[in-house]
Structure formats: structure tokens, C-alpha cells
């Protein structure tokens, strides 16, 4: 039994383990609103390119 067989016994189709950032693949701090699916770190870098404006 290898390490992968122990921890990845079944595929993740729902929950936090199934989703990741479409830019870096990170699974924490994910912004899913408006179908973005981008982590908050990448959102801060790419928000101007996506058309979001900073008001403060």
C-alpha cells in the first residue's frame, strides 16, 4: 500500500477538497462568488484585470 492509496481512497466530487483555485490550485481562501473559483491571494493580484475596482 502506497501513501496515495491510504489518503486518497475515493475521488472528491463535493466539499472543500473538490475545489481549488483555477490559477494556482490552492484550496484555502477560495472565492466562488460569480463563478470566479479563485483564491483570495490570486484575486488580489488579478482583480484589476477582472474588472473589479477598489473603492477604499
Curated annotation (Swiss-Prot):
It comes from the Eukaryota. GO terms for biological process: cytoplasmic translation. Signal peptide: none annotated. Keywords: Metal-binding, Ribonucleoprotein, Ribosomal protein, Zinc. The keyword Ribosomal protein applies. One of its GO terms (cellular component) is cytosolic small ribosomal subunit. The lineage of its organism: Eukaryota, Cryptophyceae, Pyrenomonadales, Geminigeraceae, Guillardia. Belongs to the universal ribosomal protein uS14 family. This is Small ribosomal subunit protein uS14. Zn(2+) binds at residues 21, 24, 39, 42. It comes from Guillardia theta (Cryptophyte). Pfam families: Ribosomal_S14 (PF00253). Binds 1 zinc ion per subunit. GO terms for molecular function: structural constituent of ribosome; zinc ion binding. Its cofactor is Zn(2+). The gene is rps29A. PROSITE patterns: RIBOSOMAL_S14.
